[in-house]
Amino acid sequence: MLTACAQQTKNETNMEFTDNVKEALSDNGRIDLNSLQWTREPGGFEVKGDTILITTAPKTDLWQRTYYHFQNDNAPVLQMKTREKFFSFVVKTDFIGSHHRFDQCGIVMYLGSENWLKGSVEYENDEFQHLGSVVTNNGYSDWATTAIPANVKTMWYRFSRREDDYCIECSSDGQAFSQMRICHMPAAADEISFGIYACSPEESSFTAIFSDMKITECAWKAHDGQQPD
C-alpha cells in the first residue's frame, strides 16, 4: 500500500492514502477513470482503458481578469477530490491535433472560478508554443511561460502537494521532471480537487489525449537548504 512521502516530516511518516485518492488507485497503481468527476462535461469525450480523449469546443477557456480583463470559466475539467496533504499526480498528454492559438491541455487543480491552477502547453503558431502555468488566487490569474518548439506534441506533468503548497513539473519522457512552478493557494488548505482539462479559447477544436495517470508518493521532497528565521 502506498504511503505519502514516508521519510520526510513526522506528519508524513506512515501516512496512508485515504478518501478518493486511495479509492482511485487501481491494482497496478494507476487511477481508475471511473472515479473522476466532471465539472462541465465536454460535448465529446471517450474512455479507452486507461486513456481518455477530450475533444474541445470553440471558445472554452479558464482565465480571470488580469490584463485581458475578461472572465472565462467554461473549460471542461475532470477531477478527483482528496484531503491528503502529501502526494504527486502524474499524467501524460498528447496534443498532436492542436493547431490554433491557445489550444491547450494539461493538469489542473480547480476549486472554483476564483481559485485554481493549471499547467499546459498552449499552441501559438507553426514556430512555437507556450509551456506554462497559471495560478489564480481570489479571482486574479497570472501566467508564467517559456517558449518551446511547435513540433512538441507530447508532454508529461507532475502535480505535487506538500500541505498547502503546490508544485507543477513537466517532462518530455515521463522520467526526468523539471520544475515549472511552486505556489501557495490559501483556498487549497483542506480538501482539493485535481485532475485534467482541455480547451480551445478561440474558434478551434482539437482532441487531447490523456494517459498513464497515476498517484504516487510525494515526489516533491522537503526543502533541505536555508531554514526559516
Which residue stretches match the model-derived regions?
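C-terminal motif of bacterial Sec signal peptides marking the signal peptidase cleavage site
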Residues: T3-A4
